[in-house]
């Protein structure tokens, strides 16, 4: 029986740099995760590609997937749905592949209930003023939406205690190293190592 893969969930408030950190994690030659691409009803930002950054789908398609039980998690955020298709995640974990999710806080709490064995990492900004500057710096949001995102971010930061780890995204390279360290630590936990040796011993009988 194949050892089940790790589910690594990276989450945090809007504007904290989840996407940037995720991209850096996957560019690192020492990482070997599979990335579960999220589905969203929001419009693509400049440079984003369907099937690479997100699956960009209509509201009707997304709501049908919810009704059909095909979403591991989903949330409505600032008027748009975001969520994780279930089938891909289950298939990869069962095959022993580590899966990396980059999702919103609401969605992460749903995954926590569905798959409590996951590793939940909260990405934090150095401070709230820096977070606001990052959101404004995108140049894609009105000030009304910026303020709405900031109010949501304050509530989300209060939920940090529901996560296993917190990583400050001050310098992207530093955040990546910390995430790599967390995953390595989880792979070395005795319950996983014992399980591996039990299978080896069973094979000798």
Swiss-Prot record:
What family does this chain come from, according to its entry? Belongs to the guanylate kinase family.
- Domain (Guanylate kinase-like) spans 5-184
Taxonomic classification: Bacteria, Bacillati, Bacillota, Bacilli, Bacillales
Q: Which organism is it from?
A: Listeria monocytogenes serovar 1/2a (strain ATCC BAA-679 / EGD-e)
Entry EC number(s): 2.7.4.8
Query: Mind telling me which CDD domains this protein's record contains?
Result: GMPK (cd00071)
| Coiled-coil regions, chain positions | none
Which Gene3D superfamilies does the UniProt record give?
Guanylate Kinase phosphate binding domain, P-loop containing nucleotide triphosphate hydrolases
**Example GO molecular function:** guanylate kinase activity
Instruction: Name the SMART domains on file.
Output: GuKc (SM00072)
Concerning InterPro entries, the annotation shows: GK/Ca_channel_bsu, Guanylate_kin-like_dom, Guanylate_kinase, Guanylate_kinase_CS, P-loop_NTPase
Sites where the protein binds ATP: 12-19
Protein name (Swiss-Prot/TrEMBL): Guanylate kinase
| Keyword entries, A-Z | ATP-binding, Cytoplasm, Kinase, Nucleotide-binding, Transferase
- What does the function comment of this entry state? Essential for recycling GMP and indirectly, cGMP.
The gene name reads: gmk
* A cellular-component GO term for this protein: cytosol
Q: Does the keyword Cell membrane apply?
A: no
Give the top-rank taxon of the lineage listed in the UniProt record for this protein: Bacteria
Task: Tell me the PANTHER family matching this sequence.
Answer: GUANYLATE KINASE (PTHR23117:SF13), GUANYLATE KINASE-RELATED (PTHR23117)
Q: Which reaction does it catalyse?
A: GMP + ATP = GDP + ADP
Pfam families from the entry?
Guanylate_kin (PF00625)
- Can you say where in the cell this protein is located? Cytoplasm
